[in-house]
């Protein structure tokens, strides 16, 4: 497992979600619906909705499905009532896990999530028990192999001028960190410069990470996979770093 960056959990999640394409459609539709309900149906006036639509288009969700989800969120079409909550706890190795949930039955979902935690070497905590370990950030990756001849200094100047907080060289890619409100501007600046990106999203990044390896790492990844597969789990965040 050598060579993973401290944000390996994000890459792991993306690869896992790619293998769950059918569930991704449902989860992205829910995100669009809730974003539209909370902030209105105009993506230009609703950054969360704009980001959700962008992710849906990247996943090749048909535009009519996107529009239907927006209309369900604004109340123009009948829809199930989903509540957004966060559940949190610790996994194997003392790794903090934060789950973004959308559910129509909080009691049912809480019981199922608690069962997964306890069955796989973790424990579900109280609200706020691990959320403080994470902070909301814009996160963009720039694969070097997709951008031959890329110049780190030029990218650094570009993203900082657009409002980014940091640029990291992680070997096979650059990682750009932004405040949530600067994310769209930085993303647009990269797109306008024809710089290809891989991951571009607003996420929850850990302030500190916990090293895990061997059997402990396998148990942790198994638990994270089970959370990803749960119908009510929208996002999985964890503060681990894979080491030898």
From Swiss-Prot:
Subcellular location as annotated: Cytoplasm
GO molecular function: DNA binding
Keyword entries, A-Z: Cytoplasm, DNA-binding, Transcription, Transcription regulation
Any one of the GO CC terms: cytosol
Matches recorded under InterPro entries: Integrase-like_N, TACO1_YebC-like_2nd/3rd_dom, TACO1_YebC_N, Transcrip_reg_TACO1-like, Transcrip_reg_TACO1-like_dom3, YebC-like
Organism superkingdom: Bacteria
Any one Gene Ontology BP term: regulation of DNA-templated transcription
Database matches in Pfam families: TACO1_YebC_N, Transcrip_reg
Family of this protein: Belongs to the TACO1 family.
HAMAP family: Transcrip_reg_TACO1
Cited PANTHER family: TRANSCRIPTIONAL REGULATORY PROTEIN YEBC-RELATED, TRANSLATIONAL ACTIVATOR OF CYTOCHROME C OXIDASE 1
NCBIfam families documented for this protein: PRK00110.1, PRK12378.1, YebC/PmpR family DNA-binding transcriptional regulator
Protein name: Probable transcriptional regulatory protein CHY_1525
Natural source organism: Carboxydothermus hydrogenoformans (strain ATCC BAA-161 / DSM 6008 / Z-2901)
């Amino acid at each position: 497992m050598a060579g993973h960056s401290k944000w390996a959990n994000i890459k792991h999640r993306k690869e896992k979600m790619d293998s769950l394409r059918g569930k991704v459609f449902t989860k992205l539709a829910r995100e669009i619906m809730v974003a539209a309900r909370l902030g209105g149906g105009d993506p230009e006036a609703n950054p969360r909705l704009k980001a959700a639509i962008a992710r849906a288009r990247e996943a090749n969700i048909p535009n009519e499905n996107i529009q239907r989800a927006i209309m369900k969120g604004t109340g123009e079409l009948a829809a199930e009532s989903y509540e957004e909550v966060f559940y949190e706890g610790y996994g194997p190795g003392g790794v903090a896990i934060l789950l973004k949930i959308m559910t129509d039955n909080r009691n049912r979902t809480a019981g199922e999530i608690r069962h997964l935690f306890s069955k796989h070497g973790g424990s579900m905590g109280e609200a706020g028990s691990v959320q403080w370990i994470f902070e909301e950030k814009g996160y963009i990756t720039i694969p070097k192999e997709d951008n031959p001849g890329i110049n780190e200094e030029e990218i650094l100047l570009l993203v900082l001028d657009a409002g980014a907080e940091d640029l990291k060289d992680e070997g096979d890619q650059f990682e750009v960190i932004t405040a949530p409100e600067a994310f769209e501007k930085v993303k647009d600046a990269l797109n306008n410069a024809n710089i290809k990106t891989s991951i571009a999203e607003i996420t929850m990044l850990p302030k500190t990470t916990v090293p895990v390896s061997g059997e402990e790492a396998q148990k942790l990844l198994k638990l994270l996979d089970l959370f990803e597969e749960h119908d009510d789990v929208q996002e999985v965040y964890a503060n681990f770093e894979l080491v030898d």
